[in-house]
Curated annotation (Swiss-Prot):
Its EC number is 4.2.1.79, 4.2.1.3. SUPFAM superfamilies: 2-methylcitrate dehydratase PrpD. It comes from the Bacteria. NCBIfam families: PRK09425.1, prpD. InterPro entries: 2Me_IsoCit_deHydtase_PrpD, MmgE/PrpD_sf, MmgE/PrpD_sf_1, MmgE/PrpD_sf_2, MmgE_PrpD, MmgE_PrpD_C, MmgE_PrpD_N. This is 2-methylcitrate dehydratase. Gene3D superfamilies: 2-methylcitrate dehydratase PrpD. Belongs to the PrpD family. It catalyses: (2S,3S)-2-methylcitrate = 2-methyl-cis-aconitate + H2O; citrate = D-threo-isocitrate. Disruption phenotype: Cells lacking this gene are still able to use propionate as carbon source.
Length: 484
């Protein structure tokens, strides 16, 4: 008999699964900073979704799978009239909040946007709450939503710290699926073993490729992939709730496990245990709807636009621009050639620098075809060169710094070289929180005004900006405030 014949004995669960489940079921969040940051992250994320409702490319994807479907006690989709089953509501909310690339960001060996998990969290919490009320039970409070956000951020972010999925061609939404599955399963009241099963189901799924994020195939799926992942998480948690079995060595199984099939045989590495680190250090996009590796470059470009104007010059006088940057920026958004759609443009650092140099602004509308057709943009793009500075790459990976630096040097047609403008930390960085939060609140006010009349805006603001009041509010009551 061959000694290579595999044993059919069921193994113990992989330690990675155990650690995730122990964290969501046993860890008590005591960090006031994490809860406060989660509240700010919540309102910013919802505001991003409200702004996306102005874009038909997004709204065409929203609503029930089958038109006319009615779901008793369904979950509300903020800013719409939809009440949907939690799976489809998670997709709707997740697609909205990610559509314009304006919600939070986590940068490490893997990149991502942990607030994408809010799709599954909010849909499930609202659906549970409405069904609890119908059964004469208490609804969940918004504090439960904030706690789930903190834990989902932590799971996604801690795995991302040392493990690069992009290096093997996988999209980071796999981590949204895993994190959402874990916290949603806990929210649904699954047992520890059932949550283990649910998380294993998330890992055993075929995972999304990064094809839709890169030339020559960059496209709009990158705007709804996160909704798809968090929606799938709710579905898997509900499947596990039926008692469906899991796959305990889904990561480590020889030949057939995630590591061997999709991760070049390498096990995950971890920098730190799960706690509240990620939420406390999350990057908030405050100023510009731009891929985060370009945020500081856009800020520098805005400064240069002002400096040129003061000198009586303009972008027309620019002969060349050098962007001194970090390796991740080069890998993700350094892009030449034609840009065919908004998803292509908001992942091109040359485009995101050219627009503010020309116009003194960068808004979501600037990625649309009408603006992109201006020939001055591509002409200026062609004069921009990116170069890696190893020191900036080291600072990017340094846990004590976590900078996302870009430095712009402009050479004018007459040979004049302007002083380099270096921006190390974007406005939404932890090191600039005090400066950023008032502007984040203003961003939320602006997004509320896009969708609601003044009285409704004020009611939402009053609830959202008061930490204690928000935490105590039933989830269904809070989401009812966003109905139209």
């Amino acid at each position: 008999m061959s000694t290579d014949t595999p044993s059919a004995q069921r193994p113990d669960p992989d330690q990675v699964l155990v650690d995730i489940v122990d964290y969501v079921t046993r860890y008590e969040i005591k960090s006031g900073l994490a809860y406060d940051t989660a509240r700010n992250c919540l309102i910013d994320t919802l505001g991003c979704g409200l702004e996306a409702l102005s874009y038909p490319a997004c709204t065409k994807l929203l609503g029930p799978v089958v038109p006319g479907t009615i779901v008793p006690n369904g979950a509300r989709v903020p800013g719409t009239q939809f009440q949907l089953d939690p799976v489809q509501a998670a997709f709707n909310i997740g697609a909205m909040i990610r559509w314009l690339d304006f919600n939070d960001t986590w940068l490490a060996a893997e990149w991502g946007h942990p607030s994408d998990n809010l799709g599954g969290i909010l849909a499930t919490a609202d659906w549970i709450s409405r069904n609890h009320i119908a059964a004469g039970r208490k609804p969940l409070t918004m504090k439960a939503v904030l706690a789930a956000m903190i834990k989902a951020h932590e799971i996604q972010g801690c795995i991302a710290l040392e493990n690069s999925f992009n290096q093997v061609g996988l999209d980071h939404v796999v981590l949204v699926k895993v994190a959402s599955t874990a916290v949603v399963a806990q929210m649904l009241g699954l047992t520890r073993d059932e949550i283990l099963n649910a998380v294993s189901l998330a890992w055993v799924d075929g995972q999304s490729l990064r094809t839709y994020r890169h030339a020559p195939n960059a496209g709009s799926r990158k705007s709804w992939a996160h909704g798809d992942a968090t929606s799938r998480a709710v579905r898997l948690a509900l499947i596990a709730r039926t008692g469906e079995m899991g796959y305990p060595s889904v990561l480590t199984a020889k030949t057939w496990g995630f590591y061997d099939v999709l991760f070049k045989g390498q096990p995950f590495r971890f920098q730190r245990p799960y706690g509240t680190y990620v939420m406390e250090n999350i990057l908030l996009k405050i100023s510009y709807p731009a891929e985060f590796h370009a945020q500081t470059a856009v800020e520098a470009a805005m400064q240069l636009h002002g400096a040129l104007a003061l000198a009586g010059r303009s972008a027309a006088d620019i002969a060349a621009i050098t962007i001194r940057t970090h390796e991740a920026c080069l890998r993700i958004i350094d892009k030449l050639g034609p840009l065919s759609n908004p998803a292509d443009r908001d992942h091109c650092i040359q485009y995101m620098v050219a627009v503010p140099l020309l116009f003194g602004r960068l808004t979501a509308a600037d990625y649309e075809d009408r603006i992109a057709a201006d020939p001055r943009i591509d002409a200026l793009r062609g004069r921009i060169t990116c170069v890696e500075d190893p020191a900036l790459t080291r600072d990017y990976h340094d846990p004590a710094k976590r900078s996302i630096a870009n430095a712009l040097t402009v050479t004018l047609a007459d040979g004049t070289v302007l002083d380099e403008v270096l921006v190390e930390y974007p406005l939404g960085h932890k090191r600039r929180r005090a400066e950023g939060i008032p502007l984040l609140v203003e961003k939320f006010r602006t997004n509320l005004a896009r969708r609601f009349p003044p009285k409704q805006q004020q009611a939402i603001l009053a609830a959202s900006l008061d930490q204690a009041r928000l935490e105590a509010m039933p989830v269904n009551e809070y989401l009812d405030m966003y109905a139209i």
